[in-house]
Each structure stands twice: as structure tokens, then as C-alpha cells.
């Protein structure tokens, strides 16, 4: 069930991995609207969902990383 989805835990792991690699703030997420939106909700910076993952969108970012089926980044 979606009520059992571990969104908070995924956000904590994502933020930790991000902080190990970058000093910037996560301000965008890409991927499936439900999964990426859930991640956005649980991240402190509340990044904006900008649609499905596309290479050209990622190339415009200063920093980015992809975990499973979601990418997060910083402009």
C-alpha cells in the first residue's frame, strides 16, 4: 500500500548521499510524479518536480545524482 511507502527513509538516505558529494541544495527532482513528488515532500528543501528524467534536463544542472528511478539536482 502507498501508506506503507517509506518516503521519509528514502529522503533521509537521498539527502545523506547528496551531502557526501555536494555542498549545494537539492532544488529539483525528476522521475515518476508519485515517487519524485513523495521524495520532494519529505526533503527539507522541498525541491520542485520538473517531470520525467531526461538527459538534456540533467545536463543543465550544476549538480545531480540519480538513485533508482529518481534524480535530484541543483541549478
Kindly give the residue locations of the regions a language model identified.
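Luminal/periplasmic acceptor-recognition loop/helix of membrane-associated glycosyltransferases
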Residues: 2-75
Amino acid at each position: 500500500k502507498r501508506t506503507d511507502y517509506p518516503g521519509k527513509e528514502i529522503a533521509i538516505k537521498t539527502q545523506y548521499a547528496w551531502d557526501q558529494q555536494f555542498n549545494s541544495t537539492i532544488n529539483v527532482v525528476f522521475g515518476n510524479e508519485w515517487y519524485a513528488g513523495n521524495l520532494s515532500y519529505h526533503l527539507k528543501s522541498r525541491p520542485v518536480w520538473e517531470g520525467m528524467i531526461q538527459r538534456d534536463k540533467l545536463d543543465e544542472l550544476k549538480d545531480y545524482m540519480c538513485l533508482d528511478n529518481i534524480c535530484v539536482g541543483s541549478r
